[in-house]
């Protein structure tokens, strides 16, 4: 009995020691242990605990400086209930939001706010112009993401004081807003402007993993030749200077054509 009691006490002491180690684990230990699962991302200048810590510098796999990050991880993660608050900051960009993992490939994002200089999107293939200007504000009330696709979405975004540099000239655009709502994996987007800027914009898009379609109408409110020339780069203008764009595609549309 004495030997059994000693063994039980020893196991209890070991469990307690492990619990204390996990409870007060330094964040840098956890980052080192998770290294292979970060897919090349590097966290530097790490301090704090695994439950509440920060990294003074985060680098992507290709060496891009993402910024500094702070996090708070609920201790309920020990029971499999992962709830994480993230805050990221770098010059021109701030991000904060809450993540709740529901399953291996399903997460909920809520209370997400992103503020960024529009120049962050310079170089993207769909951006026409040498440089974007203005401020982007994104608010995601809730987004349930399965894999990489939002199955449910409630969000809005604004592009304030929007303008584009092209061929050494500044193209003034105005202020725009985008509303995004989704359910069952189908996302509806509505685009508009504040009614006072140089460019009137109205648009609608529907996106799903199987198909997409959009309509967009852009019309100058002034006779600015620089703005009209920039619009003409996207397609043929109507006599009133407006531009209408529309398109659709995806697997569902391809299947429909094959059945006809």
Describe the function of each predicted region:
Residues 62-70, 89-98, 124-141, 169-176, ...:
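Amphipathic hydrophobic-ligand
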């Amino acid at each position: 009995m004495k030997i059994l009691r000693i063994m039980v006490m020893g196991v209890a002491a070991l469990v307690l020691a492990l619990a204390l180690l996990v409870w007060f684990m330094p964040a840098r230990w956890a980052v080192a242990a998770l290294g292979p699962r970060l897919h090349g991302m590097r966290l530097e200048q790490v301090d704090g605990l695994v439950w509440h810590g920060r990294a003074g510098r985060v680098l992507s796999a290709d060496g891009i400086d993402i910024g500094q990050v702070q996090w708070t991880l609920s201790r309920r993660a020990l029971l499999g209930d992962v709830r994480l608050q993230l805050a990221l900051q770098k010059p021109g960009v701030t991000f904060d939001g809450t993540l709740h993992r529901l399953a291996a490939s399903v997460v909920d994002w809520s209370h997400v706010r992103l503020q960024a200089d529009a120049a962050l999107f310079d170089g993207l293939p769909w951006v026409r112009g040498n440089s974007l200007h203005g401020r982007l504000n994104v608010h995601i009330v809730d987004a349930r993401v399965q894999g990489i696709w939002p199955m449910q979405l409630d969000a809005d975004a604004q592009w304030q004081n929007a303008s584009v540099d092209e061929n050494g000239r500044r193209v003034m655009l105005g202020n725009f807003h985008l509303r995004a709502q989704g359910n069952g994996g189908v996302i509806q987007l509505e685009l508009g402007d504040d009614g006072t800027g140089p460019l009137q914009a109205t648009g609608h898009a529907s996106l799903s993993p199987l198909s997409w379609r959009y309509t967009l109408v852009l019309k100058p409110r002034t006779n600015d030749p620089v703005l009209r020339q920039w619009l003409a780069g996207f397609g043929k203008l109507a006599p009133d200077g407006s531009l209408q764009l529309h398109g659709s595609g995806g697997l569902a549309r391809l299947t429909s054509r094959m059945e006809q």
